[in-house]
């Protein structure tokens, strides 16, 4: 009866299967293209998103540093280094784990460029050994305006962490991002790879030596889970990048920091650490067994029919963790589910035990696939939550640049308050932000498609970054 229940529950998530096969290669292409619409700084000549133009060209000038470039993290015009670094780590993880699949659809070059746009900014933000700029722009004033990034005239206030004002979460994540990216570029640009790795080591030492929570000094994107997860995350990536035993010994010595959780996010990296180190456990590092146990607890908390299930799905089948920007948690969850199912397959392990219920690798992978398919249109509304994918998708994402006329079509400045006349129009955004994945439906699988509903309509870089690895995992089987 238990096995029948599991089959029935997993079958529920496939009930909205469309007759047409989903084009995962197209979804991957558009997921990557999204990042070109989020770029800050001087845009390159090969920029494909033509409704964007140069912006933020004096960022950092108030402190005589160059903080030009990087990504606007969501629908606003502020640059937050902590979530930008997490975004970059996820992008690099996808490039490393699914290189063949991404190459198969001719997207590896674009993905590397996307990663480099992020790492170049992180390198600039790391201005000295114990100094990292963590934010460019005043979030409060920016959020009170509705302006194109090309027009923005709100203060480009700078925030930073240092030995006297630490933020181990931000420094640790930046270290993880650069370490992961160093592997991406190792065989194609060894000089750049070495630069990334050296900065990663420096940032990790800074984060670990001057331990302190970013919660104490952050204006936005504050820490709620502490910094231990970022320190383990950085050390795990540095071990992957270097093979140096000191990093392995670090995670072994601090393995008790790891805890069983049910989400993976810009704030909480434990599930990512656990997945990475469980892979090392299966490679022979027996002292890492706790991480294997903990990542399996994460998987069991998500799987429908599990006796230890903690996260319940909507009636239509999507995991529902929080109402605000729920798809960020779904895409990161599928990142772990696909990665760990691949780890188990490589290790010759066919299943895991979740209390009284056993799940095969195929069941774990199929459930992850159902989440990707829901996002791409196999859901009760028969709509894709990725802008520009399929025939029905969000038309009013909560995004300043997308919702205002492009500077090419309307060169005249649109000031802080002037933009709200466009914000309040109940019409599709004039610029289609292809590839943007919005926050997603509510707990009843409903979506209003109103840009005023930022909790559900706002895209973010880390939603897309997590989705790239998940959709790439399906390309070989599509």
UniProtKB/Swiss-Prot annotation:
GO molecular function: cellulase activity
Active site: 76, 398, 449, 458
InterPro entries given in the database record: 6-hairpin_glycosidase_sf, 6hp_glycosidase-like_sf, Glyco_hydro_9, Glyco_hydro_9_Asp/Glu_AS, Glyco_hydro_9_His_AS
Segments for region (Disordered): 433-452
Main location, first listed in the record: secreted
Catalysis performed (reactions): Endohydrolysis of (1->4)-beta-D-glucosidic linkages in cellulose, lichenin and cereal beta-D-glucans
EC class: hydrolase
Glycosylation sites (chain numbering): 29, 442
Keywords assigned by UniProt, alphabetized: Carbohydrate metabolism, Cell wall biogenesis/degradation, Cellulose degradation, Glycoprotein, Glycosidase, Hydrolase, Polysaccharide degradation, Secreted, Signal
UniProt EC number: 3.2.1.4
A Gene Ontology cellular-component term: extracellular region
GO biological process: cell wall organization; cellulose catabolic process
Name of the protein in question: Endoglucanase 18
